């Protein structure tokens, strides 16, 4: 499990910028949340994955977006060797922090804080796109592909 500091967003549409702040802080990059909200062009419906990737790179943390297809790809994500930003319920961003000692998946949610879920619940909420700094080891290449520019939700 990865020690990602849970940060709660001030507004519900700030989830993308807040998830990015959590990931940046995990990598010891300190940026004010209000600055990230502004840089991500956060609007009434939030920001896009493209905005998160652009702003993350501006602060020295290039991200790659991966589209995960296939039922078992959720395991590649939750057992990854680093935390990642998950597209969640097709409308939200959260951080996957790995697995705890009881086998539950640890999520840092900008709206609800840190909580633990079963793998099956994560699989039902995960919208098949995750952003990582670099490429995790042991990713199953046949069911996971890098998305360069176009996100499925944009």
Language-model regions: role of each:
Residues 69-70, 89-91, 112-113:
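Short beta->alpha connector loops
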Residues 40-47, 78-85, 97-154:
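Noncatalytic regulatory segments and standalone regulatory/sensor domains
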Residues 72-76:
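Beta-rich nucleic-acid/ligand-interaction surfaces
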Residues 1-68, 82, 90, 151-153:
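Cysteine-nucleophile protease catalytic domains, especially the papain-like/related folds used
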């Amino acid at each position: 499990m990865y020690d990602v500091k849970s940060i709660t967003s001030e507004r519900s549409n700030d989830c993308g910028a807040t998830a990015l702040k959590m990931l940046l802080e995990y990598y010891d990059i300190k940026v004010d949340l209000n600055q990230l909200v502004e840089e991500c062009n956060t609007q009434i419906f939030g920001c896009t994955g493209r905005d998160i990737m652009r702003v993350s790179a501006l602060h020295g943390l290039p991200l790659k977006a991966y589209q995960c297809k296939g039922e078992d790809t959720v395991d590649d994500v939750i057992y990854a060797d680093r935390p990642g930003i998950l597209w969640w319920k097709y409308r939200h961003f959260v951080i996957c922090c790995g697995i705890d000692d009881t086998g539950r998946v640890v999520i840092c949610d900008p709206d609800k804080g840190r909580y633990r879920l079963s793998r099956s619940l994560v699989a039902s909420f995960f919208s098949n796109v995750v952003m990582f700094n670099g490429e995790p080891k042991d990713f199953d290449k046949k069911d996971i592909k890098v998305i360069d520019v176009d996100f499925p939700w944009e």
